[in-house]
Every structure is written in C-alpha cells, then in structure tokens.
Amino acid sequence: MGLTDIKRELKKLDKDKLIDLIADLYKKNKSVKEFFDFYVNSDERELFNKYRDKVFLAFYPKRGYRFKLKDGKQAISDFKKLGPSSDLVADLMLFYVETGVKFTNDFGNIDESFYSSLETTYVAALTLMRKENLLDKFADRASKVVSDTSGIGWGFHDYLSNVHSDFYADYSDDTDEPIEQQEKGGIIKLGGQ
C-alpha cells in the first residue's frame, strides 16, 4: 500500500476516528511520539541536547567499552526526520565527528571503517553548512577537528585537511588582508597602509 492509498483511506475517517488513530500511533510508536512531541512543543534545543547525548553515548557508553558508530549515525538520522533547523543538524553532525576524534585521541588509532564513517559525516556536515550558508558559523570547530587529527593514522588527517581546504578555500581568501610587496627586499604593505 502506498502513500496515496493511505491518504485516500484517511480522508474517509471522521475527525474523532482520525484522532483515535493518531493517539494509538503516539502510544505504540516511539518515533511517532517524538515527532508529535516536537510538532506540538518544538523546543529544538532540548531535542538537540537529547540527540547529542545519544551521539556521545555511541562513543562513550555508560557500560562497557564498545563504541557503536551505528547508534551515533542513527541518532543523526532520527534527529533529521523530526525536521529541526539545518543549523542544529549541522551542529549534531559536526559533534559526531568531534566526538569520534576525541575518542581516537583518548584510546588510540581504531580502524579504517571508523575513520571512513567520520570522514563521510564531516563531508556531509560541511556540505550542509555550505548549502545553508553556515560555514562561517562553524569555521572554528571545523578547523579544530582537522588540527585535533594530527598524528592519527589511516590518512585520516590528510583527508580531513583536504576536505576542509576545499570548503574553506574561499572563506580564507575573503578574510585575509591583501599583502603586496613593492619590490624584492622592499617594504611589505599591509592592507591600505
């Protein structure tokens, strides 16, 4: 049964039956409950913090020492489905990468698939930031991720550094003061001095 069929059947229901159906879904399905909780009371920051905690626990579980990247990625995916602002989605994605980098620095090199997951999320986060004109807002954190990966294996640092350069090349060109050298060995003029 497709969405068109569902819509056709829902249109046949009267208001009370529709309310009962939604209430039943609300009780039985956790993701529906979260969606309607967000829809009715859209406190994005509170919801963001909840999913941020889920991402953190994927790397640093309360019990045991086994990280679960899948849980962290699922938290990001579930958060996106609720329809929060792009700003908070980008923030959560970047937090995933930051936490993964911290985990590596705390416990040593992991494996290639671990770094691949972080790389993919970093690229997705920066892509979203560019699309939504958020690169400036997250510039310091995006740079810190790269600097914090220095010395990490599997070509991880080099890859993130290249990605960062690709996304922030225009950004750094726009913010640098123009420097002109009058002649070789001459005085360097900064800005319009």
Predicted regions and their residues:
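Short, structured coil/loop segments at alpha-helix boundaries
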Residues: 3-5, 29, 85-86, 107, ...
